[in-house]
Amino acid sequence: MSMRFCILGSGSSGNSALLVTEGARVLVDAGFSARKLGQLLAGVGESLERVDAVFLSHEHSDHAEALRGLKKFPQVRVFANHATARVLQEKLEYRPNWQCFETGARFRFADLEVET
């Protein structure tokens, strides 16, 4: 399986990385505004329109800020543990396409096997 992993940004102002495989485009955290994240993705030849999912490590804004702007992208699945999803949902005006999991679980997404 071929894959590409791009660090889009890392630090107190935001964290996000892009994982591209043959079957999926996944953001690992989304800690920038959706606009800024779109710019960062464009810098590596990608776009929010092409993202299939966001995997969130936790609820801090430097890891989850873009959720506010993902309302425009209902196809994007947002993976988080139940506690993280609950905390973030209280701050949002819409309901993302949550895909909740138990911490410690394993699951498949497209051609990826994920261990949490």
Predicted regions and their residues:
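Short, glycine/charged-enriched secondary-structure capping and boundary segments
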Residues: V20-E22, L41-V44, R68-K71, L92-R95, ...
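Metallo-beta-lactamase
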Residues: H82-T116
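Divalent metal-coordination and catalytic microenvironments
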Residues: L19, D29, H58, V78, ...
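A generic structural signal for short beta-strands and their flanking turns/coil linkers
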Residues: N15, A24, R50-D52, P74, ...
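Active-site metal-binding motif and surrounding structural segment of the metallo-beta-lactamase
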Residues: A34-T84
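Short secondary-structure boundary/capping segments
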Residues: G9, L18, G45, R68-L70, ...
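Conserved beta-strand hairpin/beta-sheet module of binuclear metal-dependent hydrolase folds
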Residues: M1-V44
